[in-house]
Design a protein with these regions (language model features):
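Conserved ABC ATPase signature
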Residues: 134-138, 142
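ABC ATPase NBD coupling module
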Residues: 67-82, 106, 111-116, 229
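A short, proline-enriched helix->beta-strand linker immediately N-terminal to the Walker B motif
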Residues: 153-157
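Short coil-to-helix segment of the ABC ATPase nucleotide-binding domain corresponding to the Q-loop/switch region
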Residues: 94-103
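ABC ATPase "signature
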Residues: 219-220, 228
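Conserved ABC ATPase "signature" region
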Residues: 65-69, 112-130, 182-185
């Protein structure tokens, strides 16, 4: 079943077109790796899906729900989207429990239910006992885990990860990536992972989408994309 369907998406900033007639689909439970050079529109695509940018044209559909301009301002828990920006972007003035609980719909849950969700998330990311710590008291890897828990706490239909491991050293990056992907698989969460790392895409994803100049140039399994680039542009994007 298709969870995400994007058709003919255009986004411009001033005179500069960032996304150019972009189309993309992702099935339920799949993890997609989004690769491409800096400035090709990867983050803009995620922010458009998350409702943080209003596209100039095109459609974004989650299952049967068409995301319209009027729905873009809805809270993340109502749109069922989890978003982890680069370096996690935790709220520095909130403790870990408050960060995790931030996006939960307080109209739909009691305080005790919210506490239970936070407890479950802390267990899920292996940070039990750190709920009262402040973000600056955590390591980079721990902050990334908390950002992931905050996104998962809203029970998203899809989670968007914008280079979540980029600030970490190679060993920690590999360890945390393994843990995060395992967590997403366990939760059967549909996800898009933005990365510059070809190896990361190969070991983490079911689908690789290569971007250049605001377009998806090629989409397929990691093996298909890396073994059979369809154009010189695609070959450049894969490093071949």
């Amino acid at each position: 079943m298709t969870t995400l369907e994007i058709k003919n998406l255009d986004v411009s900033f001033g005179e500069k077109k960032i996304l150019d007639n972009l189309s993309f689909t992702l099935d339920s439970g799949q993890i997609a790796a989004l690769l491409g050079p800096s400035g090709c529109g990867k983050t803009t695509l995620l922010r458009s899906i998350a409702g943080l940018i209003q596209p100039d044209a095109g459609t974004i559909r989650f299952g049967k729900q068409l995301v319209s301009l009027s729905s873009l301002s809805l809270p993340a828990h109502k749109r069922k989207i989890g978003y982890v920006p680069q370096e996690g972007a935790l709220f520095p003035h909130l403790n870990i429990a408050q960060n995790i609980a931030f996006g939960i719909d307080r109209a739909a849950f009691t305080k005790e239910q919210i506490k239970q969700v936070v407890k479950e998330m802390l267990m899920l990311i292996d940070l039990v006992g750190l709920d009262m710590r402040m973000p600056n008291e955590l390591s980079g890897g721990q902050q990334t885990r908390v950002a992931l828990a905050r996104a998962l706490a809203v029970k998203p239909a899809i989670i968007l990860l914008d280079e979540p491991f980029s600030a970490l050293d190679a060993q920690l990056r590999a360890e945390l990536r393994t843990d995060v992907i395992k967590l997403l698989r366990t939760q059967k969460t549909t996800a898009i992972l933005v990365t510059h790392d070809r190896e990361e895409a190969l070991v983490s994803s079911d689908v690789v989408a290569l971007m250049r100049d605001g377009k998806i140039m090629q989409q397929g399994s990691p093996e298909q994309v890396y073994s059979s680039p369809t154009s010189a542009t695609t070959a450049m994007s894969t490093g071949d």
